[in-house]
Swiss-Prot record:
PANTHER family: ATP-DEPENDENT PROTEASE SUBUNIT HSLV, METALLOPROTEASE TLDD
Active site: T2
Family as reported in the entry's similarity comment: Belongs to the peptidase T1B family. HslV subfamily.
One of the Pfam families matching this protein, by short name: Proteasome
Top-rank taxon, per record: Bacteria
Record EC number: 3.4.25.2
Protein's recorded name: ATP-dependent protease subunit HslV
Binding site for Na(+): G158, D161, S164
Main subcellular location of this protein, as a coarse class: cytoplasm
Native source species: Glaesserella parasuis serovar 5 (strain SH0165) (Haemophilus parasuis)
Reactions performed catalytically: ATP-dependent cleavage of peptide bonds with broad specificity
Amino acid sequence: MTTIVCVRKDGKVAIGGDGQATLGNCVEKGTVRKVRRLYKDKVVTGFAGSTADAFILRDLFEKKLELHQGHLVKSAVELAKEWRTERSLRKLEAMMIVANESEFLLVSGSGDVIEPEFDVLAIGSGGNYAKAAALALLRTENNLSAKEIVAEALKIAGDIDIYSNHNHVIEEV
């Protein structure tokens, strides 16, 4: 369980996640890094779900990025197709948000590759809280950057969701 949120504002895309890993009802670690840079630091990914499954998917996505020379949409679609059709991958329990400087997408094991409608995507147990907070901040007149909106949304989600904490990693592309 976790919170991953991605926001686009003023030509910048920021993605962030909390650091909590749980095993059953216990917090096992509070400093897990769920947001990572890939493909020459031009792509950022954030994962929610089983840690081992997320690492498998991240590695597969990185291979797709290399194969398709960093083309985000093509790589995400190819990953979703393989994830959906490859028997050994079908049972992986994770979701991911992938982003570059101009696009970001939600990729799921059910074959979904979704571009956001309102410049916000969020996944994980705290995803709905973070999405609502980010949307509210985007719709309010303020001088907050995409990165600052992500930070505030993660803070709010961490206050509400017991499976998310306040140890955040935020990357901007």
